[in-house]
Amino acid sequence: MATFKDACFHYRKITKINRELLKIGANSIWTPVRSDKIKGWCIECCQLTELVFCSGCSLAHVCQWCVRNKRCFLDSQPHLLKLRTFEAPITKEKLQCVISMYNMLFPINENIINRFKKNVKQKKCRNEFNATWYNQLLLPITLNAAVFKFQSRIVYVFGFYEGTTACGYLPYRMVNCIDIYDRLLLDSVNFDRMSALPSDLQALYAQKYFKISRLPSMKLRQVYYSDFTKQNLITKYRTKTRITHRNVSKINWDTDIELHNDLMHNKHRILTALTTAEEKQFEVHDVNLGRIKADMFELGHHCKPNYISSNHWQPASRVSLCRWCNIKYAFRNMDWRMESMYNELMSFIQSCYKSNANVDHCSSIESVYPMVRNVFWHSTTKYIDETLEKLFNMMNPVNIDNQKVISFHWQIDLSLYLHIKMILKTEALPFMLKVHEFQSIVKGIINQWCDFSKVSELPICVESTDTLLRMYEQGELSEEYELLISDSDGDE
């Protein structure tokens, strides 16, 4: 196990470029940090161990030793992890870059074997080739990769990943790209490598190669908001900001293939980029569809539908002395925009329900209450219109000119009054609402702070370093809600 880690340790003194590229945290003397009990492959040292969350992308893909280096596969610095990273589509040319890099960094020839023989201190006969002391020579070249699927963007991180484990909680899946390259051609590459090995090690090398290179690919899995850590979220004025660290290179390459061409033919440029790179910290907003869905689900879980039957004059989030309507504690760590939306939505539904139903106290048990929760849970799904129509039909609508309408005459506060006028684009509010008007008002209240169609599905910490730098220069990393404000707010 951990053949790739051992190879990085022993091969790091071979050449100058190896000394810079093969320094990984798993071979350092640093004290390990606390793990998060997620077992998987560290994509930097390739060992199967307990993982922690990366400081660059907030995903669990790095071990408790390598996390000290603060390296991420999304960095622009050409360290070893970056050199093993390619974006889809994967072509034969890109796979050839991976093979050439392995052959350059981890060569197997007579000089290398003799060098390791001199360094090995065996308890038994020095001429005995034991896998315990020569594990670094048993590193075959395979085309297995850990694959991250960020919606339509797919990122491959190639490495020699040994062992098996359940992948249910991992943000990536293992894929074998041998058929994209050529199965027989890759076999030939490895047969040439193992031909220089002593016969005792050749069998072990072949066993490792065929075991890993013939593994089937897993089905890709989307990365979800639940895969990201909340440890690097900070709350300022009840808005959340995510801290991310990236290693930024002063030298840029347009494509991954250009980077590998310099690795093969212009090593000085790679060394310059490694020594001049700097770590940069970004504060990025955490407004994304995944987080909004999570907040909406939590809001639906904690909401008190009894408020729509009450006579409370306070906003729904401010009621504290009522056992049926008190939800104040749920907003302690929630975005203030969610609280504002909750207050307006509950106030509007209360006004509609009190205008059409004969209820007078929040202790009343009404059949409409579960549907109010569904409004929050379905607010970001395609079922929202169907849910709102069901809610509308539970408010005792009447038929006028073959159209269902409900009365709308209960008191509302001034801010909600102005907001509804803006949504309906009218000078005076109607005293009767049709189903499409009811739906438009509710969806307008829900979408008042951000347009769901324009919000990214995942946090922007998964964007490339070049994209983060461009957004930083344009001021688009700010947590201010104006950056994601909906189009309807500009119509007033």
UniProtKB/Swiss-Prot annotation:
Cellular component GO terms, alphabetical: host cell cytoplasm; host cytoskeleton
Keywords for the protein's UniProt record, in alphabetical order: Host cytoplasm, Host cytoskeleton, Host-virus interaction, Inhibition of host innate immune response by virus, Inhibition of host IRF3 by virus, Inhibition of host IRF7 by virus, Inhibition of host RLR pathway by virus, Interferon antiviral system evasion, Metal-binding, RNA-binding, Viral immunoevasion
Single Gene Ontology MF annotation: RNA binding
InterPro entries: Rotavirus_NSP1 (IPR002148)
Domain notes: The integrity of the zinc-binding domain in NSP1 is important for degradation of host IRF3. The pLxIS motif targets host IRF3 for degradation; however phosphorylation of NSP1 pLxIS motif is not required for its activity.
Entry function: Plays a role in the inhibition of host innate immunity by inducing the degradation of key host factors required to activate interferon production such as IRF3, IRF5 or IRF7. Associates with components of cullin RING ligases (CRLs) including CUL1 or CUL3, which are essential multisubunit ubiquitination complexes, to modulate their activities.
The protein, known as: Non-structural protein 1
Organism phylogeny: Viruses, Riboviria, Orthornavirae, Duplornaviricota, Resentoviricetes
